[in-house]
Amino acid sequence: MTSFFDSPSKVIGASIALRAVLLVYGAWQDAHSPIKYTDIDYFVFTDAARYVSRGASPYARDTYRYTPLLAWLLLPTTWDSIPGFFAFGKALFALADVVAGWLIAKVLVSAYGMSPSRALKYASVWLLNPMVANISTRGSSEGLLGVLVVGLLWAVLSRRVSLAGVILGLGVHFKIYPFIYGPAVVWWFDAERDGSGSPRGTATARAAREKDDGQDGQGILSKAVDFLTPARIHLTLVALATFSALNVSMYILYDLPFAQNTYLHHLTRIDHRHNFSPYSTLLYLSAAGGARTAFESLAFIPQLLLSVVVIPLVLGKKSLAGTMLAQTFAFVTFNKVCTSQYFLWYLIFLPFYLPSSSLMKNPRKGILVGLLWVIAQALWLQQGYNLEFLGLSSFVPGLFLASLFFFAVNVWILGIIVEDVGGSA
């Protein structure tokens, strides 16, 4: 297999071929099977695009909870006169997968010092992953986020501060969750890494600190001055400007439905179907009772405390990619809604984490982690099949216990990731 990974064209070609085969198979399954290959969300996307093509708002389509940019990108799916163009969005998402994989290899070579062949091996964890290819070819837009997230990592590690700010602002506008990377990126960009001086700050700041050593108030002020490096300020301003410009533009075009569906809806979202989260049963009971409870908003507290505060502060100076992996894993694990598409949010960081991880150094441990993660999903899916296809009431105890087991496995894996990243140089 060494010769295979020595050729970027072969690896990229194989990843494209995998997705092409799945696209063709998906079209066949949709036409011949009662169980459809295409994700229901894809029909939501394309319906929204059709409304836009008629001069209406994408939010005229019920359950469209995304930026208008996505509906705009899928306008070619409304060109009914051109055969096959309804699948344009799937092809776009699949292509985005491949671009994200190419960026992964690029970062591994430029920032991690890997040889191109070794970088392609690890990038293939994403490029040749059938789960990744399946989700994108079913019509999930996560591949687009993959490009933005890896693009953000590349821009930061390349010290392209303006570009990193633009990508971060665009990513948060496109889908809320990339905001968690803001603290990690800002914390990582100290004075040493942005080239403006030593990590202890400028000469003026150091002189002030030495003069006021022992004075707590002045010491805190000095640390605050040290923290505000040019790169951190620049990145924050560019990201906020990009995010604000996009949101103001969309609000002018689509008014309150844009804000409500794209952002506010997620604060009190109730979604108990296809949900791996242990909150799913509580969401089901809440929906069945017709009453909203405080936990729908309180559920954000442990999730955000871990992913936005604790993990970036503890790990941010160790490894940026490793920190982003831990943040994303915590965010998804503790989210009140967790679907298969969300797994792609953290799987994209595996090529950066695996080379120095304990899972590679101890293969038995790696195999055990992989098996438990798959088994936990399989147990949940078996209960979900009983509910969705057999009509059995399996919310309690079946789905609830399966969700708790999956949650426990993921918390254990998160602990391994944090320990590995925390121990890195």
From Swiss-Prot:
GO biological process entries: cell wall organization; GPI anchor biosynthetic process
Compartments, record wording: Endoplasmic reticulum membrane
Pathway recorded for this protein: Glycolipid biosynthesis; glycosylphosphatidylinositol-anchor biosynthesis
Highest taxon, organism lineage: Eukaryota
Any one Pfam family match given in the protein's UniProt record, by short name: Mannosyl_trans
EC number(s) reported in the record: 2.4.1.-
Residue stretches spanning the membrane: 11-31, 85-105, 144-164, 166-186, 233-253, 295-315, 340-360, 367-387, 398-418
GO cellular component: endoplasmic reticulum membrane; glycosylphosphatidylinositol-mannosyltransferase I complex
Enzyme class per UniProt: transferase
A GO term for molecular function: mannosyltransferase activity
Entry membrane topology: Multi-pass membrane protein
UniProt keywords, alphabetically: Cell wall biogenesis/degradation, Endoplasmic reticulum, Glycosyltransferase, GPI-anchor biosynthesis, Membrane, Transferase, Transmembrane, Transmembrane helix
Function: Mannosyltransferase involved in glycosylphosphatidylinositol-anchor biosynthesis. Transfers the first alpha-1,4-mannose to GlcN-acyl-PI during GPI precursor assembly. Required for cell wall integrity.
Family indicated by similarity: Belongs to the PIGM family.
Protein name: GPI mannosyltransferase 1
